[in-house]
């Protein structure tokens, strides 16, 4: 697996750009993102391909995770890390919350048929439209718990195995069966993990008063019908550097109650068995002074350890240090140097100087060259005049000698 990843400082920088463009909204549309993307001077067809790759959920907009993907692709193209836009999103760039969509899209690209229209008669008055297939990290973690508690040896779920969950929900039996049929187009007695997560997601939204969707995206259906997907974390974890911590707040208080009673009965409530690891977008710091604060906190911890070490070493100061333990004075000195370095980097970032500048403006360089050229010409003219003056002085000296 590639060792490449999006560094934390990149995420913080991308957040500053995203926040300045989004006006407080969770997503950017094409026109909002166009200004910063076109500053890269990439061709329009390249930017279109970057957009298509980054828009993982295909909603025509970029949320923050997708924006990070787009920015990293653009920078890699500009810096020569990539010679062309890749055909598929690299595994290390796939956001954890959308890994199932990317995996399903890849399955679909091998030739799976398009999604079919699934008819239902869910026209119950009072239900809301606006169902969203996107699973936020906290909801997905809860679905994972329910799946893990009920899966059989083949990693599949039967309809009847979730009956206690159905009993705890405010969802009619007809709607539950409609959701099951939606994710189980082949009418199998059991469904795989992807289908189970989608099934629970539909029930969650229906529990909150949203109308059950009539169709299912082609990419999702392809993943439902593919029984060879490997879900072992050690074998396939395409988004290991993007894992959120599962603490994201849900949009409404009612949604947070989905499955809680059921999970409490199982003894796993609040303890998600699925814990993705990697970059935590929910902890992205928006304050540019964050780095200084964090380093000062680390320095305080080091000083506390230093004081403790000094107290423990009282009475043994004259003994030779042959135990290989670190010198806390040196550690403190290095930490202070690191703090000074980080503060200087932050200052350069704010002022747009130092290594933070990608290069001098070409036009300004040309102007400097012209100025230097003019100065050289002026110096040459001045030298010629001084040589003429010197020659004249020598002539006068010779004439004076002859006159004597």
From Swiss-Prot:
**SMART domains, per this entry?**
EFh, EH
**Chief localization class?**
membrane
Start and end residues of each EF-hand domain: 42-77
Per UniProt, residues of the EH domain are 10-100, 139-227
**Gene Ontology biological-process annotations:** actin filament organization; endocytosis; endosomal transport
State the membrane topology: Peripheral membrane protein
Question: In which compartments does the protein localize?
Answer: Cell membrane; Endosome membrane; Cytoplasm, Cytoskeleton, Actin patch
**What would be an example GO MF term here?**
actin binding
Q: Specify the superkingdom.
A: Eukaryota
Q: Where is this region: Disordered?
A: 237-256, 307-326
What's in the keyword line of the UniProt record? Actin-binding, Calcium, Cell membrane, Coiled coil, Cytoplasm, Cytoskeleton, Endocytosis, Endosome, Membrane, Metal-binding, Repeat
Residue ranges of coiled coil: 279-381
* Composition bias type Basic and acidic residues, residue spans: 307-324
Sequence positions that bind Ca(2+): 55, 57, 59, 61, 66
Q: How does it assemble?
A: Component of the PAN1 actin cytoskeleton-regulatory complex.
Q: What does this protein do?
A: Component of the PAN1 actin cytoskeleton-regulatory complex required for the internalization of endosomes during actin-coupled endocytosis. The complex links the site of endocytosis to the cell membrane-associated actin cytoskeleton. Mediates uptake of external molecules and vacuolar degradation of plasma membrane proteins. Plays a role in the proper organization of the cell membrane-associated actin cytoskeleton and promotes its destabilization.
Family, per the entry?
Belongs to the END3 family.
Name under which the protein is recorded: Actin cytoskeleton-regulatory complex protein end3
């Amino acid at each position: 697996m590639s060792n490449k990843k999006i560094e934390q400082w990149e995420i913080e920088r991308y957040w500053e750009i995203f926040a300045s463009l989004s006006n407080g909204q969770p997503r950017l549309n094409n026109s909002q993102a166009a200004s910063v993307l076109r500053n890269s001077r990439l061709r329009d067809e390249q930017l279109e391909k970057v957009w298509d790759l980054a828009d993982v959920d295909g909603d025509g907009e970029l949320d923050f995770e997708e924006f990070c993907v787009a920015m990293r692709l653009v920078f890699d193209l500009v810096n020569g890390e990539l010679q062309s836009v890749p055909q598929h999103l690299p595994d290390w760039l796939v956001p954890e919350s959308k890994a199932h969509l990317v995996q399903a899209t890849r399955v679909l690209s091998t030739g799976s048929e398009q999604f079919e229209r699934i008819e239902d008669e869910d026209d119950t008055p009072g239900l809301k439209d606006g169902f969203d297939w996107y699973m936020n990290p906290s909801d997905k973690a809860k679905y994972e718990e329910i799946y893990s508690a009920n899966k059989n040896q083949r990693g599949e779920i039967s309809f009847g195995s979730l009956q206690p969950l159905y009993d705890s929900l405010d969802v009619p039996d007809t709607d539950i069966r409609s959701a099951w049929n939606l994710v189980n187009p082949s009418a199998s007695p059991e469904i795989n993990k992807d289908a189970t997560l989608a099934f629970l997601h539909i029930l969650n939204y229906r529990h909150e008063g949203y109308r059950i969707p009539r169709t299912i995206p082609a990419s999702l259906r392809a993943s439902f019908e593919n029984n060879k997907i490997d879900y072992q974390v050690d074998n396939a974890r395409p988004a290991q550097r993007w894992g959120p911590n599962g603490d994201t707040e849900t949009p409404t208080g009612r949604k947070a109650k989905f499955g809680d009673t059921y999970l409490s009965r199982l003894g796993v409530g609040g303890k998600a068995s699925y814990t993705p690891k990697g970059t935590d977008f929910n902890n992205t710091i928006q304050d540019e002074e964050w780095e200084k604060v964090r380093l000062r906190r680390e320095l305080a911890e080091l000083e506390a350890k230093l004081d403790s070490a000094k107290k423990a070493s009282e009475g043994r100061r004259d003994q030779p240090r042959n135990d290989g333990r670190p010198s806390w004075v040196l550690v403190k000195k290095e930490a202070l140097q690191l703090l000074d370095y980080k503060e200087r980097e932050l200052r350069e970032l704010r002022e747009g100087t130092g290594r933070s500048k990608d290069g001098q403006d070409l036009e300004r360089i040309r102007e400097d060259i012209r100025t230097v050229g003019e100065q050289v010409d002026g110096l040459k003219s001045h030298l010629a005049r001084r040589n003429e003056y010197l020659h004249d002085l020598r002539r006068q000296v010779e004439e004076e000698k002859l006159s004597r």
